[in-house]
A protein has these predicted regions:
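Acyltransferase
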Residues: 1-156, 160-162
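Flexible, low-complexity segments
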Residues: 20-21, 129-220
């Protein structure tokens, strides 16, 4: 991750990313009709598609979309991720990726590159090279989880970002839990999410939760 970030930061800052409140088919048709050098970067929702490309091309696309009353919003990013503008670092990134000793997942994992259950390919350098250039299929990934009956979603990160997109999907009676929140005590947030998991019937390893603290059980 750090090597990829370092390589990206050495790229010229000529790109932009734009969130579009339209389906991916509509967005792709407009891009192809106007021969714009723009790539689909993420498919987050049926009406939330992110594109990535050179700033001038993205500006042209934004104007075309606004004429059709399609809402858009620029993403606050340094570079045009998941696009052809990442190609200049592909060779060096592949060299780094080939040095890693990969292990195949021991638990089922959904690939946001394919939107399907990850295969052994995820433990290869070629997979992560594709991940650098190809779109994130968040919608397909979440749809698959819904088909499998998954209803508990925990975002592991410094702040909840994906939970907001997940809540827009038609997943009923779901639990959407952050691990951390800005301006919220870390331990308090973890305990709140643990409490929700417990009341939802999830088996909690309380010995692991309490291992760093002196405690005793009280009869209720």
């Amino acid at each position: 991750i750090t090597q990829r970030a370092s390589l990206v930061q050495n790229l010229p800052i000529i790109g932009a990313m734009l969130a579009i409140m339209a389906d991916v088919t509509t967005v792709r048709q407009i891009i192809e009709q106007d021969l714009l050098k723009i790539d689909i970067a993420a498919i987050n929702h049926r009406r939330n598609t992110v594109v990535s490309g050179e700033k001038k091309a993205v500006e042209v696309l934004k104007e075309l979309l606004e004429k059709q009353n399609i809402r858009t919003q620029y993403l606050t990013v340094s570079h045009a991720f998941h696009s052809r503008l990442m190609s200049p670092i592909l060779e060096k990134f592949e060299q780094v990726a080939r040095q890693i000793n990969y292990q195949t997942p021991q638990i089922p994992l959904i690939s946001n590159l394919t939107g399907d259950v990850a295969t052994k390919e995820i433990a290869t350098a070629s997979y992560w090279c594709r991940h650098l250039l190809e779109p994130v299929r968040f919608l397909d990934s979440m749809n698959l989880l819904q088909e499998q009956g998954i209803k508990i979603f925990i975002e592991i990160g410094a702040k909840p970002i994906l939970l907001g997109m997940g809540r827009q999907l038609p997943i009923h009676d779901g639990y959407w839990l952050p691990s951390l929140r800005p301006e919220q005590d870390d331990w308090l947030q973890l305990l709140e999410s643990l409490a929700t998991l417990y009341t939802a019937g999830v088996s909690i390893d309380w010995s692991a939760v309490e291992q760093d603290y002196a405690s005793c059980r009280l009869p209720l």
